[in-house]
Amino acid sequence: MTEVARLQSFLRAVASPGRTVVEAPPFTAFLDPDDALRFVNYSIPADGAAPDAAAVERLRTVFRKHGRLPRLEWIEQAAPLVARALVEAGMREELRTPLMSCEPTDLVDANVGVEELTVAPVGEADLRETADLQRVAFGDTPLAASDEPRDPRAHGGGAVLARCAGEPLAVAAWTPIMDGVTEIVGVATAEPWRGRGLAGAVTAAGARAAFAAGASLCVLSPGDDLAQRVYARAGFAPVATMLHWSDPD
């Protein structure tokens, strides 16, 4: 198995726990039954997939049936023909970003411009604050009082939360470890505290915790060039290209 195939297999496997999995060949949809947030609902094409217009429309039907925006996330090198079919079907590219990886010996602790900062594993009492910080940072609204926050610790994942004087400032999570691989996800910093090195600090802390839990390789996808530079300073380097596509809102 090539490194790209290994990483795509990992991303497919780690998407399954806690989600409704629906096959729509050559796609597999991973749908959160409790959260319509676009970034936690997506599909992954089979390696080497070459879908036609009918296949894309079947995928759309699956997402719409579940009240979710049709989306895809995959490694370009694993299925390079998919993007052409999506263009022809009227979908759009949300994001093209490097897939970056880091091994334990690569990890670098970040310098942080915040005094009295604490970074600790997320526990039961932190779940709502963690979820709200991530949602607001990604342009969504806080959870409704009746909504239960996702627990990043479910199925063997985890998260770390940075605080100052009790105030939650930044968070990073990691997915369940599969064959020694985990993904750092949900890295978010509260808007007033950005630009102080917190994203790099929680990324490094999350990766270190994942390595301690048994991972031998951490991967992540930066949202933009600035994030890529932040993660590079923490020891991550590009290995492939991640594509994020969706229907227009």
Predicted features, each with a name:
Residues D52-R60, V185, T189-E191, G195-A212, ...:
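Conserved acetyl-CoA-binding loop-helix of GNAT-fold acetyltransferases
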Residues M1-K65, A78-A79, A83:
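N-terminal charged segments
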